[in-house]
Amino acid sequence: DVCSSDLSDGLAIAEKHGLPGIIKEFIVSHHGTTSTGYFLTQYLNDGGDPEDVAEFYYDGVKPVTKEQVVLMICDAVEAASRSLKDYSQQNISSLVDRIVDGKVREDQLSDADISIRDINRMKEVIKSYLMQMYHSRVSYPKRKENAKK
């Protein structure tokens, strides 16, 4: 089961290395109680029983701090951004909005002391960062050995 192994493996690694409790709290809250969207959708599209979907939901806890919310959002956006075929400003903006709005709709942020203003600011910062990260660069040509200096 992908969902439970992600959390249990993360906690086991944290225990093995003696990481503090606060790190373990981040591990169990970074997916909250969300579904594994890809696997759940694939299961349902393949004719899976909509009443038998518990294994497609993480058994973590909802984030309770702003920092845990930031990790949850950044983790989800980073993973989803890898699937983009076009890193245009519009596509990046739509992706970030869809993911953050989905977390709000799924009630994942309700236990955290975070304002709408904080959420909107986070969205803008993430969009800006992704645009910088994925902007294309000009390919610099190598100078030919016989080229004039």
Region roles according to the model:
Residues 2-4:
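Short, small-residue-biased leader/transition segments that mark boundaries at the very start
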Residues 6-149:
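Terminal helices and disordered tails flanking the catalytic cores of nucleotide-processing hydrolases
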